[in-house]
């Protein structure tokens, strides 16, 4: 069968040819083991190769396919790929094929009155999905998938955040954690019923804006502009009292106000520990995805630090060349992705035994990279959000080596729908502040345009075998 295909392809043109050895990790699309290398014209591109493989498979209905050569998606002709990578046409190329990706198309936008700083999604099999947003107006909002606001948090005068909220996360189906410029971390009780979002605990300890939080079980990590990482418990019995010098100043007016509103019954607690070591604002703090006793933090001081959360001890410091603004753990690859002020994402090996700091660089953004999220379906997928007004999707298998080491370019770029067809210089007016990637809801991003934007695709990044 391979010989017939080779003859058929050769008869189409007399141009330069190359031998391709096709393989796939998708058992449903695998060619017979007897299929050997196939001689094809080097002028062929993805569509023609897809047609060829479908003919070899004798599929009833053509399956659109993508092709990876040496880990890089084929976006040109075979000849152009060979030339760009300095590969001889005499070489037999190993070509992996995967089902063609469905781009993440825009499906909905939810509008706010102010900048939207953060977003998270609650999705489970028992209830309808919920989206929670944090805004610079100091409020949390819970949305249903029909773009309706079903719950709003208390305002400042009723016991809520006293200024802009910077981050929000669902701790569980019944609890929410938020943080903000008012230097607090707050735990909220959540229900879909009438009361919605009600304050549970106010945490005091930071002396600067709390810009990012991460949650795991009954633990919270916070990253603050005061150069520290906060470590907190959601259990009142485990949480220490707040030292008086860390409580907000209580003028007669504010004292009277607290007595008149719901915050009078809200517990106030201190941190289990404040982790010190950074020499500039801390941009992100996250838990190790496989060992919640380990934490990581990134900072404007250019470093990634590893913490033992049991002893509150600094374990290791990895120093880069640029300010690091966000972090995401990729445990299957023993890597940690960090967005930078230098417009790229650096994949860092956080292990103390690692001989190099940067394992890979993801390039393409034109402004600071401030948020990251993992693909829920593929261990190779990652999305980044940037102040350039875009979110970019990466397949970390798709790489090449140049003078900067191992680098990768994004496979998709999601622009802000609010920008229309125009391109904003430096992302002006459409900066992305946060992004979440949920298996059911899709890619949810928020930002300076005061919009929750939802994009959805299918198999955006092929799964691992």
Curated annotation (Swiss-Prot):
Keywords noted in UniProt: Nucleus, Repeat, Ribosome biogenesis, rRNA processing, WD repeat
Similarity field: Belongs to the WD repeat WDR12/YTM1 family.
Protein name per Swiss-Prot or TrEMBL: Ribosome biogenesis protein YTM1
Chain residue ranges for the region called Ubiquitin-like (UBL) domain: 18-99
Task of the protein: Component of the NOP7 complex, which is required for maturation of the 25S and 5.8S ribosomal RNAs and formation of the 60S ribosome.
Quaternary organization: Component of the NOP7 complex, composed of ERB1, NOP7 and YTM1. The complex is held together by ERB1, which interacts with NOP7 via its N-terminal domain and with YTM1 via a high-affinity interaction between the seven-bladed beta-propeller domains of the 2 proteins. The NOP7 complex associates with the 66S pre-ribosome. Interacts (via UBL domain) with MDN1 (via VWFA/MIDAS domain).
Species of provenance: Coccidioides immitis (strain RS) (Valley fever fungus)
A GO term for molecular function: ribonucleoprotein complex binding
Region Disordered: start-end pairs: 235-272
GO BP term, example: maturation of LSU-rRNA from tricistronic rRNA transcript (SSU-rRNA, 5.8S rRNA, LSU-rRNA)
Main subcellular location of this protein, as a coarse class: nucleus
InterPro entries: G-protein_beta_WD-40_rep, NLE, WD40/YVTN_repeat-like_dom_sf, WD40_repeat_CS, WD40_repeat_dom_sf, WD40_rpt, WDR12/Ytm1
Subcellular location: Nucleus, Nucleolus; Nucleus, Nucleoplasm
GO cellular component, one term: preribosome, large subunit precursor
PANTHER family, sorted: RIBOSOME BIOGENESIS PROTEIN WDR12, WD40 REPEAT PROTEIN 12, 37
Alphabetized Pfam families for the sequence: NLE, WD40
Transmembrane spans: none
Spans of repeat WD: 111-153, 160-198, 205-242, 277-317, 319-358, 364-404, 427-465
